Amino acid sequence: MRRHARKLEACHHRPFWRFLRRFGVDPTGHGWDGWLHTERPPKELEAEALGDAAMLQMIGVTSAEFARRLKNPLATIFRWAHSAGDPNSRPWRSRDFEGLCYTPLSTCGRRRIGSRERLLQVRGKHADRLHIECNALATRVLFDAEGTACGVEYLKGARLYRAHANPSAARGERCEVRARREVILCGGAFNTPQLLMLSGIGSAEQLRRHGIEVRVDLPGVGRNLQDRYEVAVTYRMRGPWKILEGARFERGDPVWQRWHRQKEGLYASNGAALAFVRRSAPNIPDPDIFCMALPAQFDGYYPGFSANLKKYDDRLTWAVLKAHTHNNAGTVTLKSADPLEPPRIDFHYFEEGDDTQGRDLKALVDAIQFIRELNRPLLHCGLLTEEAPGPDALTAPALAEYVRNNAWGHHASCSCPIGLRANGGVVDSSFAVHGVRGLRVVDASVFPRIPGFFLVSAVYMIAEKAAETLLHEARRKST
């Protein structure tokens, strides 16, 4: 998939190699001419952060403590220097790497960029080929007399889906759109399996239970749901962060004005002061723990979570992320045949799932203990005080209970996986739905196992692969 990654990326945070690649020298594995621009925080912001005595002490002490615990610190430091702290550089993909890194940003000119900007860019260039319909809720796939997918039925109207925080009581206007060639579903890990089931594709038993005519008995639809785990270790600093002066995290505040006019300052970053990757166990092939330090109170995503950014200016949060999770027992099932009703989503976290050895839970507990070790000197000198998990969670069992009660995830995937139909697969290697002509799925639901630390780049890569597959097949059929 490296080829697809290079095709979509436009890397701006390795200027030396960006220059040398013009002469055929490029060991980094980055892409340079794609649509997804990647940058790192401005140099002046890094200098300002190090001008904050508390920030400098935190970064210096925790970095030294991390290096002291490395099995081979000289080799790791050499690799860090070779890649300049870039976590996505090809040399870092050596299977024995663990170390400190910076967190690249998907920004262009200090403005966030993603699939939204890509779609608008393509629509601007090819308005005759791409039409974007807002306030439209897909309700089912349409089929012709031969059973080939030929379109999508949808409801037109705002806030129709009852997952909305303020759903409308209206039912919407029923509409249809027809496909000349194929239908491609990109609804994500929750809505793609729901839409397939509403269209008669899924577990026959479940479909009949809701009065839906069975078109294809495909039990893998909505199964294999996965996510990674994330949990927070939070400290209270001795005083407010200097770097947060003037930041009210709202449009028009002094920090926003600086970003708006000069594209500088705190709002030109994601807020991560320090990050590292490591293994939760020495015998696993790839690092599976990513931790980053944020000068903020952050304990997950929930309605109003960002209010804590305004409320506290003296917090340090270590966000602990467990990747390559072992639990694939999550499910997406229908609550009813009503397309306005969200599906029932159950990840079956930890012991509820199929990670019977408790490897994910143990990895998170060990990571919290590791964060505590890194910050112990700062506790002893009075720079910070632990807020969470706190003094009531000192033992491994108490930390395990803290993780069970507070872990979250926001990279749901794998609910319509690529694979053999007999093994629970929903789509084949060309993203075509088993047992159906003219229907494909291209989104986060198609992964058999959740990839990497952060899902979005992997989704972009499979989208590039799917585009290549579709174009190849279209050319083959036209000859």
Task: Spell out what each predicted region is.
Residues 1-479:
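Structural core of flavin- and non-heme-iron oxidoreductases
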